[in-house]
Amino acid sequence: MQAAADACPGMLDLHPARDGAVARIRLPGGYVTGLQWAAVAALAGEFGDGNLDVTARGNVQLRGLRPGAGTSLASRAAQAGLLPSGAHDRARNITASPLSGLGGRPPLRRLVQALDAAIVADPVLAALPGRFVFAVDDGTGGAAIARSDVGLRRTGRQAELLIAGCSAGILLPVRAAVTAAIAAARAAVRLGVGTSVTRIRDLPGGGHAVATAAGGALRAAAPPDGARLPLGALAAGEPAVLVAGARLGRLTVAQLRLTGSLLHPAEVLRLAAAGRIVIPLAVTAAGALARLAGSGLLTSDEDTMSGVTSCSGMACSRSVADVRALARPMPGHPRIHWAGCARGCGAPADADLIVATGPGSFLLGGQPAAITIAEAS
């Protein structure tokens, strides 16, 4: 039984919204091949409204789905390798350091793939709710491991196990890391995750019982991730790498196809928080950057919208204001997330939250914010 509070959409459990149904495609680690990205673009164009939302965990959402589209959509997604197990649809939430394996950083893709395969192979873990998240960090951050339920931080040939964002005091060979993570997740299910609560931190006693079951004990909390990925070309390497940003986390089908066309054939796209898209390039960086900017994607941190994110706004029945139309930078808040209700869906971990409490009223940091619709538009 899924926890009552778990309302996260999937490919099989579509979420009703004002603009039609919403489906979420899980991309473990934020990794997606060129062929899969082309399939996602086709699904967005054929079944949805032609747009795609990048979530805070590096997954993607199709919006505006027509009634009755779920079965055909799921079948097509499965054919593209995007839905390996219907029973584990919501369980495959894995974040990963988005630059792993690039520029001399340690690779994580095989570890993420092994973890995903182990989740899908375990019937017990089908009970994990959509809010439960695994994280795999290469030591450079970017995986939001401090906010994860079960985390693995790789250090050379070893990996540290984290529970509810805290070290469990367990360091083990990388080859044994997946087994330890799965054991911790199974313990979480046994203790009530998926039935009474959706996150380990919400269990009675938090993560201590899970850590004990895993053979460890909770220690220091992991520090939050540092700076966001910078937009634009990264330091020289092979292949060249660009980071683009989806404005307010939303991509068009044309942007999907463009980013896919630039991808190096031996590489994968990596999706990250705040709508960041890491593209290992098959072409030179200068020409690619101009094409991305011309398509409307963010390509420079100097763009005033580079630190602005938003929920789905009036497309969601909970929203009380059109925050996507109102979203703009706020002085003194370099990273700001506009939310149409108190849930604050899609907020990056490092963003300040401005919440609409009515069509023209907002809270920023819990305090009334003097913003008028005319001023914000």
Please place each PLM-identified region on the residue numbering:
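Intrinsic, low-complexity N-terminal interaction/targeting segments
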Residues: M1-P16, T299
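Small-residue-enriched alpha-helical segments and adjacent helix-cap loops
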Residues: Q2, A21-L162, V174-R175, T179, ...
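Short, structured segments at the rim of ligand-binding sites
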Residues: G34-W37, Q61, T198-A209
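Terminal amphipathic helices with adjacent charged low-complexity linkers/tails
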Residues: A69, V193, R201-G226
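Internal alpha/beta scaffold segment
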Residues: G165-S196
